[in-house]
């Protein structure tokens, strides 16, 4: 249903910023969008390599001279926070996603990423959208915040635009703490939470 509704807005020529309900908005996100790509999305990555991409090596000794090859990898874009520019490519992307979800028992975030990043080949036609990854210290996931950013001296902490509590099950409590920390000046609001979901992390 979500992707059908998004397609309707795009068909009307409206650009769309979609945000899940487990997100704290600290600054106006419209002031921080670049609007130079079809899809501008938040990453589940937690550092430059996992968010923006890395080259990895494959070693097949049996190939001898050509034993070493390379691939590319990055973590998924989150299907709970993204901006879509209204055009034929993003309309096709939404259609590809919801048509698959009607037929497949699949997680929508997996299908969303497959349709964005997997390559057109043979009879398989992707929407071939252009992509920009939102900066992970502005559009933060909760792993970035609780595992790294909050440990920095306050003067060195970047001020986020939005914080998505997607990595932790106690979403409401962490959202309330982020509101107190960023919007109400409570310097101790984040301290009681573990970095991960387990005590001591």
Residue ranges with predicted function:
Residues 1-56, 76, 81-84, 88:
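GT-A fold catalytic core of metal-dependent nucleotide-sugar glycosyltransferases
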Residues 2-5, 25-26, 66-70, 145-151:
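Eukaryotic intrinsically disordered and solvent-exposed regulatory patches
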Residues 17-20, 59-63, 138-144:
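A short linear-motif detector with a strong N-terminal bias
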Residues 47, 61-63, 167, 201:
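Functionally engaged cysteine thiol sites
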Residues 56-59, 118-119:
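Short alpha-helical linear motifs
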Residues 58-72:
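Short, flexible, basic/aromatic active-site loop/helix in glycosyltransferases
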Residues 72-201:
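Catalytic core and acceptor-binding pocket of nucleotide-sugar-dependent glycosyltransferases
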């Amino acid at each position: 249903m979500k992707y059908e509704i998004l397609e309707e807005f795009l068909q009307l020529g409206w650009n769309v910023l979609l945000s899940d309900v487990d997100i704290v908005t600290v600054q106006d996100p419209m002031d921080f969008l670049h609007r130079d790509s079809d899809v501008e999305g938040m990453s589940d990555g937690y550092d430059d390599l996992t968010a923006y991409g890395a080259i990895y090596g494959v070693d097949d000794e049996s190939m001898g001279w050509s034993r070493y090859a390379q691939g590319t990898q990055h973590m998924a874009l989150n299907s709970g926070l993204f901006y879509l520019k209204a055009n034929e490519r993003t309309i096709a992307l939404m259609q590809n996603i919801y048509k698959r979800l009607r037929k497949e028992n699949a997680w929508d975030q997996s299908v969303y990423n497959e349709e964005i990043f997997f390559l057109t080949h043979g009879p398989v036609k992707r929407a071939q959208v252009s992509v920009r990854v939102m900066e992970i210290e502005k559009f933060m996931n909760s792993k970035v915040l609780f595992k790294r950013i909050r440990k920095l001296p306050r003067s060195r902490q970047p001020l986020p635009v939005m914080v998505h509590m997607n990595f932790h099950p106690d979403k409401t409590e962490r959202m309330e703490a982020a509101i107190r920390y960023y919007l109400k000046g409570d310097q101790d609001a984040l301290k009681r939470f573990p970095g991960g979901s387990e005590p001591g992390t």
